[in-house]
Amino acid sequence: MREETPEQPAPLRSGYTTGSCATATSLAAARLLLGGTTSDAVRIVLPKGQQVPMRLEFCRAWENGAEAGTLKDAGDDPDVTHGALVFARVRLSAAPGVRFHAGPGVGTVTRPGLTLAVGEPAINPVPRQMMERHLTQLAAEHGYTGGFEVTIGIEGGEALALKTMNPRLGILGGLSILGTSGIVRPFSCSAYIASIHQGIDVARANGVRHIAACTGNASEDAMRRRYALPEIALIEMGDFAGAVLKHLRKAPVEKLSLCGGFGKISKLAGGHLDLHSRHSSIDLPQLAGWAAALGASAALQQSMRAANTSQQALAQAHAEGVALGDAVCAHALRFARSIVPAEVRLEVFAIDRQGNLVGQAGEERS
């Protein structure tokens, strides 16, 4: 989960994806094999046509091939791979075409549901296309009619992967080589949202009919206590409730349980799909209004409006016997229902900071 960062006066700096790093290093290694030339940088073309220089840490002969490496620069994005060494080892082969292999620190797909087949190295389609295009052009320039065996690795990738969703997605042994544009946009969250979609797709492909989308570890633990769900049924949505709800339009499941902290669920109840404090805030007067509909006294409503936090407002309501937690979950369920297909049964749970259940609503109680 990403932490809120202070505002910065200067524009945030973009970086490059692991797919761009893999393209640059595989091109540099292949160029050394075919032309005998090396340098401390290589220029690649991104999917939208931009030409960018990529600095190399090394480019040298390796066994019966060549290898090159670059340090992943994610710009100002808090990417887990920022600063990691991405490297490519390339061998020439008699058969034409480009064949990809997972090196140290790059994972292998072990579950269906992803865009890659089981057993394939976790090198996504666009990075594969980028490497194929650059290597094919290089081969044509040198009159080379053979093929390439390309192994991509990330130094320390196996340990870094444990900080990502890869193990839950069934990508084992390391990280994925990612990217659709070749560029990392700071705080775009596109990779995180893509992993949410992948998590749902993998769950469906493996026969899971009930998923639980949770805002964090405490809410995941609450769902584990309530249901005997397999690990792949637990979707870490963080603040991106909209990523879950909208994806279910085209990839529905039988049942969705939404679980989060009371404050996050309050935002969802208020009609927000991005629950991060940068994009949505808790509406204390709205909470007081919902309490009023449940019979809250004028004094309680006033104290709730003046509360410091949603948790304080909740405690005030519960102290007077007003079931605010359940009401907030009911409002959140109605909003989620307006997005999710009717075939998906919904339920919503809210927890406090200790992970205790403070509210729930559902179309099916269990």
Swiss-Prot record:
Record-linked InterPro entries: CbiD, CbiD_sf
Keyword Methyltransferase on entry: yes
SS bonds (residue pairs): none
Pathway the protein acts in: Cofactor biosynthesis; adenosylcobalamin biosynthesis; cob(II)yrinate a,c-diamide from sirohydrochlorin (anaerobic route): step 6/10
Enzyme Commission (EC) number: 2.1.1.195
Catalytic reactions on record: Co-precorrin-5B + S-adenosyl-L-methionine = Co-precorrin-6A + S-adenosyl-L-homocysteine
Keywords: Cobalamin biosynthesis, Methyltransferase, S-adenosyl-L-methionine, Transferase
Transmembrane in keyword set: no
An MF annotation (GO) of this entry: cobalt-precorrin-5B C1-methyltransferase activity
GO biological process: anaerobic cobalamin biosynthetic process; methylation
Family of this protein: Belongs to the CbiD family.
Protein name: Cobalt-precorrin-5B C(1)-methyltransferase
Provenance organism: Pseudomonas paraeruginosa (strain DSM 24068 / PA7) (Pseudomonas aeruginosa (strain PA7))
Lineage: Bacteria, Pseudomonadati, Pseudomonadota, Gammaproteobacteria, Pseudomonadales
Gene (name only): cbiD
